[in-house]
């Protein structure tokens, strides 16, 4: 199955939440400048993740994405974390322009 979810800011939070609630639905998730309670993420360990965040984000602290990455890694998930130096809350701009953004996404399939 190849169902993908991408969200930014509050949508990034919803991306994490939906994948935790319905992990069997999604092949891949790209939360951008989102956050989540990392203790919930083991439920999503079979979903491919690519997490983006700016290290200067004052709206959604970057620590949320850092902790999500650590929790997913600890659960054995296929996860990549990309942090943009000096980027504020609009990290979706460099994320959507990341060199292989769509190529990576469309390669993902459910386990």
What are these regions (language model features)?
Residues 48-52, 58, 62-111:
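C-terminal catalytic histidine-bearing segment of alpha/beta-hydrolase fold enzymes
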Residues 9-13, 34-38, 55-59, 86-91:
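Solvent-exposed loop/turn segments at secondary-structure junctions
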Residues 1-45:
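Primarily recognizes the serine-hydrolase "nucleophile elbow" in alpha/beta-hydrolase
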């Amino acid at each position: 199955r190849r169902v993908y979810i991408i969200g930014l800011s509050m949508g990034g939070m919803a991306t994490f939440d939906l994948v935790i609630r319905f992990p069997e639905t999604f092949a891949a998730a790209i939360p951008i400048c989102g956050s989540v309670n990392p203790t919930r993420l083991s439920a999503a360990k079979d979903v491919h993740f690519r997490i983006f965040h700016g290290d200067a984000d004052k709206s959604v602290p970057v620590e949320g994405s850092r902790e999500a990455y650590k929790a997913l890694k600890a659960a054995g998930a296929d996860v990549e974390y990309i942090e943009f130096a000096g980027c504020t809350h609009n990290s979706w701009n460099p994320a959507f322009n990341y060199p292989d953004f769509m190529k990576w996404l469309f390669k993902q399939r459910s386990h």
